UniProtKB/Swiss-Prot annotation:
EC number: 2.1.1.45
One Pfam family cited in the UniProt record for this chain: Thymidylat_synt
NCBIfam families linked: PRK01827.1-3, PRK01827.1-5, thym_sym
CDD domains (UniProt xref): TS_Pyrimidine_HMase (cd00351)
PANTHER family linked: THYMIDYLATE SYNTHASE, THYMIDYLATE SYNTHASE 1
Function of the protein: Catalyzes the reductive methylation of 2'-deoxyuridine-5'-monophosphate (dUMP) to 2'-deoxythymidine-5'-monophosphate (dTMP) while utilizing 5,10-methylenetetrahydrofolate (mTHF) as the methyl donor and reductant in the reaction, yielding dihydrofolate (DHF) as a by-product. This enzymatic reaction provides an intracellular de novo source of dTMP, an essential precursor for DNA biosynthesis.
Protein name per its UniProtKB record: Thymidylate synthase
Binding-site positions, (6R)-5,10-methylene-5,6,7,8-tetrahydrofolate: H51, D169, S263
Gene responsible for this protein: thyA
Residue numbers annotated as active site: C146
Keywords assigned by UniProt, alphabetized: Cytoplasm, Methyltransferase, Nucleotide biosynthesis, Transferase
Species lineage: Bacteria, Pseudomonadati, Pseudomonadota, Gammaproteobacteria, Enterobacterales
Gene Ontology CC entries for this record: cytosol
Gene Ontology MF term list: thymidylate synthase activity
Protein's pathway: Pyrimidine metabolism; dTTP biosynthesis
Length: 264
């Protein structure tokens, strides 16, 4: 993941010191692009160990259209606990918007299903997008979406995806985001009988929290290792029928984890 290390180095070199909502403060740049060729390996960070179970279970949670952390907690995943209310709900975030986007007329739109239909029937469409940024629901969300819009592209029977992320916690969040969308591309490619192509990532406010800067400096001293491979062990009848046990990461040999405090 040389792209990730290069990004950290740039933020440290030219980033702007900014105040932020959490009170922690950030070193920030505006506008950045990265590209990952999924044919060359699964882009799971090797310069520190990532908790792959959290990544997979969170993605499956989104795809269920779920917005209550009960499913995550049942599977010993706590990454959303800080934002849940007393009932375990986090508001109409990713899962709600992906699977049940509410219209002013009271209808609900399943954006993921619509994309799957287009990929199978009209793969040259330029309208294969999913948005999590529902302006009418923002005030109801415990944490508004950071990764807000993604688009699919098919050429030569190969599936690529581009993500726009308005706000990016580079040290803690970004490794999860890259891996999560790469898994999603693999899943959708399998369901649509396509090969995997590129994952393109675009960030808006791309930042290191001030309490992560020294940790990031430690991380960039580590030389990236060979990327692992992602294998999906079976093909369910539907994108929404995958389970954690269907995924296998082969050849993941990361450096030890570097723990950082999350800013809320």
């Amino acid at each position: 993941m040389k792209q990730y290390i290069k990004l950290i180095k740039k933020i440290i070199r030219v980033g702007n010191q900014k105040k932020d909502r959490t009170g922690t403060g950030t070193l920030s740049i505006f506008g950045y692009n990265m590209k990952f060729d999924l044919k060359k390996g699964f882009p799971l960070l090797t310069t520190k160990k990532c908790h792959i179970a959290s990544i997979i279970y969170e993605l499956l949670w989104f795809l269920k259209g779920d917005t209550n952390i009960a499913y995550l907690n049942e599977n010993k995943i706590s990454i959303w606990n800080n934002w849940a209310n007393e009932s375990g709900d986090v508001g109409p975030i990713y899962g709600k918007q992906w699977r049940n986007w509410s219209t002013p007329e009271g209808h609900e739109i399943d954006q993921i299903k619509n994309v799957l239909i287009q990929l199978k029937k009209n793969p040259d469409s330029r309208r294969m997008l999913v948005s999590s940024w529902n302006v009418g629901d923002i005030d109801k969300m415990r944490l508004p979406p950071c990764h807000v819009l993604f688009q699919f592209y098919v050429f030569n029977n190969t599936l690529s995806c581009q993500l726009y992320q308005r706000s990016c916690d580079v040290f803690l969040g970004l490794p999860f985001n890259i891996a999560s969308y790469s898994i999603l591309i693999h899943m959708i490619a399998q369901q649509c009988d396509l090969k995997v192509g590129d994952f393109l990532w675009t960030g808006g406010d791309v930042h290191l929290y001030n309490n992560h800067i020294e940790l990031a400096k430690k991380q960039i001293l580590r030389i990236p290792r060979t990327l692992p491979k992602l294998t999906i062990l079976k093909k369910p009848q539907s994108l929404f029928q995958y389970c954690f046990e269907d995924f296998k990461i082969i050849g993941y040999h990361p450096y030890p984890a570097i723990k950082g405090k999350i800013s809320i």
